[in-house]
């Protein structure tokens, strides 16, 4: 399943904070949204939340911006939608 992510840099914690429609808002402690460190951190946060391995998270678009498109494998679309519904 493909989801959109909005990265919020310079945060105190690394976490998913909310969802606006189908866009996840992810806080990261890194300063730059365009670094490999930030991209890997976003993948790690998303993988932990959805209960999949980091290798099952693919960054499809937005490697250098705040808006990223991520593909999640290893769970059905139904399971992912259920987890998305848990986010305020």
Regions found by a protein language model. Give the residues of each.
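Contiguous, often N-terminal, cationic amphipathic patches that form binding interfaces
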Residues: 1-44, 52, 58-63, 68-88
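The alpha-helix within a helix-turn-helix
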Residues: 47
